[in-house]
């Protein structure tokens, strides 16, 4: 039997061990036919698999198949899902500083909002809110508008007493200031609630109106830009820590700003297409002039109220809001927006 030379033996001994393949599941609540499934989540799946050289296998589960939307963050934290994409505000009170990006008037595109939110996260200002998971990226959608079943809303008086679905408690505060009655529910519940008349309307960006077929249950669409929603794609901490160094490097390389921007740009494209689809069958109402000033004053009161609540709890609400404003300015300059 031939003997190995000393050099060959040393070379074999020092070769890195081939990392074993790891299978990860990725849960989200958007429909299987949504643009997010193909352009964001499956694209991320392919990127990670390619980056890892096949050492990581990702399977994406859409449409709440691994858990309800409201449990998304908890499912990632507890290992029910290895990775989950969810809305921070679905876990009320858990992400008070992150939800500052939801406040009205901070930005007018998902790309800029996502850039600013990721910068805020990267600064370490939000570390305490995510200490029990491993965050991949954060982002926002574009401006959210008001969509109503039968009532044309063009004044604050029109909105008085209407039962309006709010995505989060922060946006509920805004609706209260506007005179509406906020009703909490995740986005997948909107279609049925509106069809049954349980709610009179709902808050959604144009992109999501089309994505959840909500244009089928609302005839009137009031464009104002009330809010933006905060999202996070995050990973079970134990699952991440169990990866090999090479596998961690692959995950890390497909995390952060690049994917925040990818998500934001996708939402901006979705808003253009969603608005076109929605207005093909619905009526657009825009808030202008003196009436707009009244709505903006109500939005400003909601912002002041939320930040005051955080400051009173000893949280840096006002400081974080000002940081977001600074990041928005940076992102607009960097992105040419």
Predicted regions and their residues:
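Bacterial N-terminal signal peptides that target proteins for export
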Residues: 1-6
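Expand to "…catalyze enediolate/carbanion chemistry for C-C bond making/breaking, isomerization
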Residues: 10
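N-terminal signal peptide c-region/cleavage motif recognized by signal peptidases
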Residues: 14-19
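N-terminal secretory/targeting leader peptides
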Residues: 20-112, 121, 128-337
């Amino acid at each position: 039997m031939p003997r190995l030379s000393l050099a060959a033996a040393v070379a074999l001994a020092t070769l890195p061990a081939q990392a074993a393949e790891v299978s990860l599941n990725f849960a989200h609540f958007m429909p299987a036919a949504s643009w997010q499934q193909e352009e964001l989540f499956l694209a991320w799946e392919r990127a990670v698999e390619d980056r890892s050289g096949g050492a990581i296998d990702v399977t994406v589960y859409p449409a709440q198949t691994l858990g309800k939307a409201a449990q998304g963050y908890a499912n990632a934290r507890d290992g029910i899902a290895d990775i989950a994409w969810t809305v921070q505000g679905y876990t009320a009170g858990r992400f008070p500083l992150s939800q500052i990006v939801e406040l009205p008037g901070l930005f007018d595109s998902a790309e800029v909002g996502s850039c600013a939110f990721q910068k805020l996260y990267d600064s370490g200002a939000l570390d305490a809110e995510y200490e029990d998971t491993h965050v991949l990226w954060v982002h926002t959608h574009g401006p959210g508008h008001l969509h109503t079943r039968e009532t044309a809303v063009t004044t604050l008086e029109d909105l008085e007493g209407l039962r309006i679905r709010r995505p989060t408690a922060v946006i509920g505060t805004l609706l209260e200031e506007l005179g509406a009655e906020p009703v909490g529910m995740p986005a997948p519940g909107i279609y049925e609630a509106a069809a049954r008349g349980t709610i009179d309307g709902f808050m959604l960006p144009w992109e999501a109106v089309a994505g959840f077929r909500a244009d089928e249950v609302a005839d009137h669409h009031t464009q104002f830009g009330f809010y933006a929603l905060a999202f996070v794609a995050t990973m079970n901490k134990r699952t991440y820590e169990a990866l090999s160094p090479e596998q961690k490097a692959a995950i890390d390389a497909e995390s952060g700003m690049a994917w925040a921007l990818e998500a934001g740009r996708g939402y901006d494209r979705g808003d253009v297409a969603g608005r076109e689809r929605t207005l093909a069958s619905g009526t657009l109402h825009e808030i202008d002039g003196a009436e707009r000033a009244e709505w903006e004053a109500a939005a400003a009161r909601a912002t002041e109220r939320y930040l005051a609540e955080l400051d009173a709890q000893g949280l840096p609400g006002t400081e974080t809001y000002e940081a977001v404003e600074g990041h928005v300015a940076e992102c607009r300059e960097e992105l040419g927006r």
